[in-house]
Amino acid sequence: MFSRWGEFAYQHRRVIPLVVVAVIILLYLTFGMRLSDRMSQEGWDDPNSDSTTAAAIEARTFGRDNNGDVILLFTAETGTIDESPEFGHIQEYLTNLLANHPDQIDHITSYFDKRVDRLISQDKRTAFAAIALKGDGDQTLKDFRAIKVQLAGASRMFPGVSTQVAGATAVADALDEGMSQDISRAEFYALPAVALLLLVVFGSLVAACMPLIVGGLSIVGSLGMLSILAGFTQVNVFAHSVVTLLGLGLAIDYGLFMVSRFREELNRGGGQDVRTAVRRATGTAGKTVVFSAAMVAVALSGLLVFPQAFLKSVAYGAISAVGLAAVLSVTMLPALFSLLGHNIDKFMVRRPRWVGVTGVVARALGRGRQGGQAGQRSARGRGRSRSYSHSRAAAATPATASKGSKKLSETWWYRLPNWSMQHAVWVTCAIVGGLMLLALPIGDVEFGGINETYLPPTNQVRTAQSTFDREFPEFRTEPIKLVVTNADNDQLIQVYQQAAQVEGLTGRFTPTSATKDGITVLSAGIVDRAHNQSVVDQLRAIEPPPGVKVYVGGTPALEIESIEALFDKLPLMSFYIVLATLVLMALVFGSLVLPAKAVIMTLLGMGATIGLLTWMFVDGVGANLFGFTPGPLMSPVLVLIMAIIYGLSTDYEVFLVSRMVEARERRAATDVAIKFGTAHTGGIISAAAIIMIVVCGAFGFSDIVMMKYIAFGMIFALLFDATIIRMMLVPAVMHLLQDDNWWAPPWVKSAAGALGHRVSRNQGQGQGQGRGRGRGQSGRPKRAPRPQPQPPRAAQPRQPARPVRRPRTNIPEPDSRASVRMEQDRASSSKQPSNQHPRREETIELATGNLPPQRFNKPRTTSPSTHRHFSPTTGRNTKQVPFTELLKRLESED
């Protein structure tokens, strides 16, 4: 299917780019430009909780509690505020503020009107004015921004009196501004840095622009898609940053994989035509990109099981962005490849040798067309034929396959997995133990809600809010509330007496207003946020009189019940994403063992990542260096980072193991397939991880703690996943499993084959080296008869030892029809029965005097990648060697 799409893209290469760009621009102009007006600040709480019900009852009866929307603090620099000559000017300023903004301000309660003692600090230096805004929900933030300029000007109007702005709405506005700056920072700093990295990796200006085109279109298109979603469901403002982060990073990664595979196909076999290269690149890398995006989308869709609208909006937006990135990669890029052809390597840039890790990645990815031409010239110089130099066996084994001018067997991405396989047991134990050790800090994790501590310590709004909480603890903007319904005076007294015994409060509960329609609201402050859970639990234990209902409400209760809802749904989310990814990977790999291995390794990496995040953001390691205040984590953000990490980990697993499956489809041994996959994708995965880390790094300097949390979580996960897990742990574990890696029941292989995978029915059969047991479809060893050795021929006179060029028919290409027919002729001429014990891999090798031994593959039961070498001197098989190594020996004899 994907190959046919590549053919379609080639045939319509001039139309597809124009259509795609036109659709993206139209989407942005029609919807994307209105996104800021459609975003919401709400959606953090569980809509089905008692605290949400309490808030709804209070708002319906008394109106929204808007007293803490905006707080203006006035502090006298010398003396008391009453003695300040600016006292009257402040009173006049507040009166004019209310008169100038009747549509935004409901009322103002201040010390400067009636000089209420509760509205001034104990030292008499600081007094405040509470500004209640008229709007509800998202309109509240718009009302605040309408008066924001006039509030900021107050600091310059009263000499000798400092003015600060605090309050819940002011904090929300500061958080929103910080997220907008994060997006601008990512676009301003991350994109140029990514462009430079792509230029180093590809060595070509044109090739480096391809992923950037996909990334840019993905950002623009995702804004339009988010705006469309906001018309149907609530989309939190935080979703914008997450969608930009994921959409940009994955779009560039997918573009990197597509460009790398197209250049590889373009230079395969001495150079293919552009049409074939586009078709094969789309049929291989394009298919992998789509399935990889499906893995990420499945992981993110697990967020939909939670009741919070914030998580749902992030899931919708992120899934849309990831899907758009994949669609652009398999539509826009194949068409551009078709237009460019070999010009994709135009404007080559000389890469210095001191470029470090990126240089290693670049050399592993090859030098494109230039390297391919150099390889062709070298082959012609040695007198090799084109068909011989680029045989299927050579392409199936990293020992001889070459991407550009550097053989894969000489790259770091071949040597490191090879070393890990040689020390498989020790590597597995060390890495698993280390990852489990890093996960230990998870036991110290703490959860909380969003507040001013998510802002930088130097932020003016955060400083003002801290001052207000310190000077006026009984007026905290997040009080705990009791909403009592259907209670008479005696019953209300019973509830009040029980509430007065609760510990951890700043004072006794007081009614916010007179009882109305049988509903009374009591309010009190909590001494410390760390006591929220204890206070809520004590209030839940209140036994109301018969017929009376007591709801525990307020911000602390909303946070506690939101956390409880998350942990109630977390097992369901985990079961769903694990099961869904197992099914998808089984269809991609044609195996059940590989998906199970991938899930276990992903969970190990996730545990280590969350452990490091807890160590950093809860325990405070690096807090001064990165400019944040350690404290409880916001539970929805923790669930979000878990889904993102799981999706990214399975994303890279698909890219890595897909190349191993390709080698296995060509009947390569297990160890050879492992080296083939890691050697071909190690550099690409590392380059993709570096690029993703650069994008995340731009968000790592965010002013918002929760964006830092997500960014550092992705950075840690990428470092673990692209290095020790994919390059060391995966090869080691797969080497230990050997042919059991490929086991699956017949129906799984049939389903994988229906999706275009060439999964052979005997792929589970023993074809590899080492200690693995060969298994067929049913899981039982599949036995094949081995023919008797041919009787020795008559002795021939010894010829001088000199190289003799073998006839063309003596060295057939692996799996060729000629070799099968010649072997069948030899087998039919033998009269002896084949009753010896079967072996996993067999060849018929005949000594022919002074000519090199002739080797013929046995059809269907023989792996072309590995053979036993027959020694004419001892008359028995010696060690197993790769088929391509035998070809290299023959080449040296020529």
Protein language model features and the residues they cover:
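Short hinge/gating elements
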Residues: 38-42, 450-451
